[in-house]
């Protein structure tokens, strides 16, 4: 469009110069074309300036946002987390363990630098994800209530049904050692627990003694899954 206007303006200018006695209409057309050309160029220049200022503003806003986020993460406290006991893949844990927010950055949270989902962590000489800190001093009643909730709200229907009905039947009568063992079992992936209970996958070495020894917690869980009494089961209330 701009090239067409320039060409037309030049033609009118040449015609006006070679024909001084040309009609007034031709002269007015040339003036209109030149005015359009100058207006178009002015608009393009102003548009470039506006785009440049917008880009500068966007860049400044992004840098301010990053600085604000960095300052916020660098001063994260435990009482500001969305969950006082975050799960391994909680967004809070992911943020606290990102490259820019490691423990070397001076974070005040006890969760910084702790990768709860790491398979390299060990617990009681068992190669398993690290336990969520802060649960060592739980009262027995609090632990039982938490475990009942965890068995009902894991997210996999098959595993939820097996674990929650087992918890309703046995959890309150378990000794503290087996209660802690059941707590550690819930740290394992849902489908792994389901396949171990249904004997569709080999039991790993860390749980072999519990699942293969009669009377142990894992062995009783397999018997509960087998449901020899053919009982009708449904999700218990919380």
UniProtKB/Swiss-Prot annotation:
Keywords: Chaperone, Mitochondrion. One of its GO terms (cellular component) is mitochondrion. Belongs to the SDHAF2 family. The keyword Nucleotide-binding does not apply. It holds the Pfam family Sdh5. Interacts with the flavoprotein subunit within the SDH catalytic dimer. Plays an essential role in the assembly of succinate dehydrogenase (SDH), an enzyme complex (also referred to as respiratory complex II) that is a component of both the tricarboxylic acid (TCA) cycle and the mitochondrial electron transport chain, and which couples the oxidation of succinate to fumarate with the reduction of ubiquinone (coenzyme Q) to ubiquinol. Required for flavinylation (covalent attachment of FAD) of the flavoprotein subunit of the SDH catalytic dimer. This is Succinate dehydrogenase assembly factor 2, mitochondrial. It comes from the Eukaryota. GO terms for biological process: mitochondrial electron transport, succinate to ubiquinone; mitochondrial respiratory chain complex II assembly; tricarboxylic acid cycle. Residues 47-82 are annotated as: Disordered. Coiled coil: none annotated. It is found in: Mitochondrion matrix. InterPro entries: SDH, SDH_sf, SDHAF2. This protein may be expected to contain an N-terminal transit peptide but none has been predicted. Residues 68-80 have a biased composition (Basic and acidic residues).
